[in-house]
Amino acid sequence: MTFLDMLRAAERQNGSMLCVGLDPEPTRFPAHYSGDVSKIYDFCAAIVDATADLVMAFKPQIAYFAAHRAEPQLERLIAHMRRAAPHVPVILDAKRGDIGSTAEQYAKEAFERYGADAVTLSPFMGFDSLQPYLRYHGKGAFLLCRTSNPGGDDLQSQRLASVEGTPLLYEHIARLAQGPWNLNGQLGLVVGATYPAELERVRALAPTLPLLIPGVGAQGGDCAATVRAAWRAAPGTSGEALDTLAPIIVNSSRAILYASSGADFAQAARREALATRDLLQAARQPA
């Protein structure tokens, strides 16, 4: 089963477009974990168990593990996901970008060491920096396109005078990913919920690519506006027609992980995940 197959299956089984981002910060853990970095696995596994039937994907952010020398806990966590939620794909949020043998090692890390189903990548160094990942047929790769941070404008919203049509950089990335770079149907795009107009533009340029959309929850992105922009559904479009479009994966991290600082953190995370999932699904319904 390919990554895209897994996404669609999880979407159907859990009725969800929600991705829970796993960005563990020990200083924000409940008091009974006392900020203990050795409890990263325990904290994240509890979140996984509480939300596995509500999500389309899980997205662990590798830096939150590596900063605490907790890569073995990440390996253990992904192994736990395979047992507890085998139907839910795992997106390793690594944002790697390098060439040659270094990119080969990063790809090996993502898909062999951690066993992720997909990975986030920077396309800045061009197609040859992506090829080592695309050799893992059936795996997915999400390219940074229009990111949720304000500083993304510094590069992503600049016009490319030497490219036909003088597109903005993020538009050029979307076209390349939709076209010549997507040799095996493995690519997707990362587009922030904080920029709904640009999100709609990316969907128009890349209608068959899955979109990973961070920025709802703590970053302020609006669930309903995000779904409307990503689906680009005209009034009267049927639900069946919407189901044929490429998946969107809407990520929320901190709002779910830290919904409570008490012993009930996992139950609170479930409540927040359920509420977010239902908001997303309600926004999906055609007018």
UniProtKB/Swiss-Prot annotation:
Pathway: Pyrimidine metabolism; UMP biosynthesis via de novo pathway; UMP from orotate: step 2/2. The active site is at residue 95. It comes from the Bacteria. PROSITE patterns: OMPDECASE. Its EC number is 4.1.1.23. One of its GO terms (biological process) is 'de novo' UMP biosynthetic process. Pfam families: OMPdecase (PF00215). The keyword Lyase applies. The keyword Lyase applies. Coiled coil: none annotated. It catalyses: orotidine 5'-phosphate + H(+) = UMP + CO2. It is an enzyme of class 4 (lyase). Signal peptide: none annotated. Keywords: Decarboxylase, Lyase, Pyrimidine biosynthesis. One of its GO terms (molecular function) is orotidine-5'-phosphate decarboxylase activity. Belongs to the OMP decarboxylase family. Type 2 subfamily. This is Orotidine 5'-phosphate decarboxylase. It comes from Albidiferax ferrireducens (strain ATCC BAA-621 / DSM 15236 / T118) (Rhodoferax ferrireducens). The lineage of its organism: Bacteria, Pseudomonadati, Pseudomonadota, Betaproteobacteria, Burkholderiales. The gene is pyrF.
